[in-house]
Amino acid sequence: LDREPRPADLEDDVRRGLGVITARSDALSRFMTAYARLARLPPPRTAPVDIAELVRRVASLETRMPVGIAAGPDTVVHADADQLEQLLINLVRNGVEAAQETGGAVRIGWRRDGNRLEVYVDDEGPGLPETANLFVPFFTTKPQGTGIGLVLCRQIAEAHGGTLTLANREDGPGCRAVLRLPVGGG
């Protein structure tokens, strides 16, 4: 900067350099925010949650494509509604992103299996090429991803005494995410 005469492209070089610094700073900020969210998941504050109402609300929040609903039996679970909503929003968002790759659809539904509730999100995307890293913190295949979405989802499921699994569908193309929760407590 102290050189005289200044190179003709100095301003362009400085702008490019500042652009790189800004991009890396933004990426680091996203990483740190994600890390903090992972480290500070609060314990669930449970109350009765009507699953039909929760599923309808989550489906209505998606604006990129309509999300089908496969209604199940009337079911109430004791859970943290905000945490379950965040979990389902993330699963639906992932399903929509996958379905947009193929022009497919997304459906969310639920069913009872004895004293367990299964909430599932089916997409008609390309499916999962590999499942080993699905729940590895900070692993992502998305350009702007943080790699914590499914990790947080699994933490929420487990904090409620439940499980979360993802697998390629057997009944057609795409993936099925299944949240299993105890009915009547957790």
Spell out what each predicted region is.
Residues 149, 153:
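Short alpha-helical Gxxx[C/S/T] motif in the catalytic ATP-binding
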